[in-house]
Amino acid sequence: MRPTVLCFSGLDPSGGAGLQADIEAIGQSGAHAAIACTALTIQNSQQVFGFEATSKELLLAQANAVVGDLPIKCVKSGMLGTTDNIAALAEFLRAHPDYQYVLDPVLVANSGGSLGDQATLVKAFVELIPLATLITPNTVELRALTGVTDLDQATQKLFEMGAKAVLVKGGHEDTPDFIKNSLYIDGELAASSTCPRLEGEYHGSGCSLASFIAGRLALGDSLKIAVQHAETWLFGVLKNAETPVLNGQKIPKRF
């Protein structure tokens, strides 16, 4: 059986982000996706209306059900929603130190809607940061996690908090013509990439990127190669994104 990525994330009814994005991106990477649902969200491509989080007990039961049954090589997390779920994931990862782990530190949806109490989640994420093979914050999340405005200083603060590798995504920066991503490993810049900035906004781009990276890691790629493959794939997916009927954020066309 193909190597498996176990995804801890929420269910998005629009199919643009969350678990559906994870499943599609991991499938396109060549790996198999298993899921542990952290929350049922009420959202579309325009906004988040609310969510109901899974209990810690149910979340761990989902994850433990597939351990041993599937060849899990990597864990990926997106929306976790509550501090209990963050604690549950940390407990799971400590029980399985051989799993690689990609942490996408989701605090709000791309549409701006809340996916949990941000201040509380930021404090709880401290427990996950040292457990991650790679953390994939956008610049808004990076500043929120560290409390530091300068991006270079914020990145170094993450390493002081125990990070091993960080992919800083520049899509939220004021660069009208391009987007720059920077990969840091052990506190040093390991690679950077730029791509043209596409028009519009996209629902689930961050989920897709982190999940594709996780899939490639599960298949044995190095961190630098996994990120390179994922960035190339994502740009094509976003170029072909589809616009919803009510003109919300575009849905990446992942297959």
Curated annotation (Swiss-Prot):
InterPro entries in the record: HMP/HMP-P_kinase_dom (IPR004399), PM/HMP-P_kinase-1 (IPR013749), Ribokinase-like (IPR029056)
SUPFAM superfamilies to which the protein is assigned, alphabetical: Ribokinase-like (SSF53613)
Protein name: Hydroxylmethylpyrimidine kinase
Activity regulation, per record: Inhibited by pyridoxal phosphate at high micromolar concentrations.
Assembly information from the UniProt record: Homodimer.
Alphabetical GO biological process terms: thiamine biosynthetic process; thiamine diphosphate biosynthetic process
UniProt KW Disulfide bond keyword: yes
Species of origin: Acinetobacter baumannii (strain IS-123)
Pathway in which this enzyme or protein is active: Cofactor biosynthesis; thiamine diphosphate biosynthesis
Gene3D superfamilies in alphabetical order: 3.40.1190.20
